[in-house]
Amino acid sequence: MSETTDYGASNTGANEESLRMVSSQPIGNEPVSDEELRPHVLGGFIGQPRLKAQLQLFLDAARKRDVPPDHILLAGPPGLGKTTLAMIVANELEVPIRVTSGPAVQHAGDLASILSSLDVGEVLFIDEIHRLPRAAEELLYIAMEDFRVDVMVGKGPGASSIPLTLPRFTVIGATTREGMLPSPLRARFGFTAHLDFYPHEELEKLIERSANVLGVNLDTGSAHELALRSRGTPRIANRLLRRVRDWAIVHDLIVVRPDDVKEALALYQIDSEGLDRLDIAVLNAIVRNFNGGPVGLNNLAAMVGEESETVETVCEPYLVREGFMIRTPKGRVATEKAWQHLGITPKDDVSKLF
């Protein structure tokens, strides 16, 4: 197994999002990827079959050529396994991995210090790489392309730049916002992998694997109930599984049945669609208070007692993706699916909108 060095990697995200059970960001001190649940080889990584096939070919070719692989960019929503894949790459290559994050790199010198300490073949994993300072990005361009960093010696007019040659290494960058990466930085990655949300079937397999690791005896159908509520995101699935495990321990359950899953997660106000209290409050406001919409973002946020940014960035992406809401030039509109989920008969003109 590869050696891991952590240079201030941080778990960041909106404060409001980090308090939700269905958040794709880590909650509190929750690790980005639990060591006990993390697979260490590509064959043990569940889901993302096309990406795995591409990555396997990429790594096999590097091993046969006996050179470190090209730099890798992992892009996709939070909680889908980007950090886990970075660890797997290092394990597959049997090399150490250094871990840092964009927010942890305050100055270009911080990054230069890390780069200058790398050995041949090492992996440098930069989480949230889109949040690197501009000066650090520019330093990284040269390091990734030419395997050198320019060290400034002296100050003022007499300052000079001395090139420091670096051993060949591999950068793995992870980002939830690929569009924020400057084109010169994106161009230096030889392989870009896009992670997608998981279908229920793959999430069920992941939940069953995690349950075995955690010692949770799930009855037939229990993994399915968990998958329905996990928003296509492994991090959420594992978090909800832990809460169900707590329920089973407190209630002395030997086998966790589907009804136990429903009851345990109902305690946290998580329904069968993965919607929580805030999601339901938003839908209720649109449907009950604004007759289905359209309603402006500020009015909607005021109705549910949240900041506009919270509603827009925390709630809306999932509600839109799952077809409960649409954004129109006039405002937010609840779909027929939203009315039905709330148990309210849609008004006559709702179905005509879609």
UniProtKB/Swiss-Prot annotation:
Cellular component annotations (GO), alphabetically ordered: cytoplasm; Holliday junction resolvase complex
Compartments, as annotated in UniProt: Cytoplasm
Region (Large ATPase domain (RuvB-L)): 4-198
One annotated GO biological process: DNA recombination
Binding positions (DNA): 327, 332
Family matches, as CDD domains: AAA
Domain notes from UniProt: Has 3 domains, the large (RuvB-L) and small ATPase (RuvB-S) domains and the C-terminal head (RuvB-H) domain. The head domain binds DNA, while the ATPase domains jointly bind ATP, ADP or are empty depending on the state of the subunit in the translocation cycle. During a single DNA translocation step the structure of each domain remains the same, but their relative positions change.
Similarity-based family: Belongs to the RuvB family.
PANTHER family, per database record: HOLLIDAY JUNCTION BRANCH MIGRATION COMPLEX SUBUNIT RUVB (PTHR42848:SF1), PTHR42848
Entry protein name: Holliday junction branch migration complex subunit RuvB
UniProt source species: Bifidobacterium longum (strain NCC 2705)
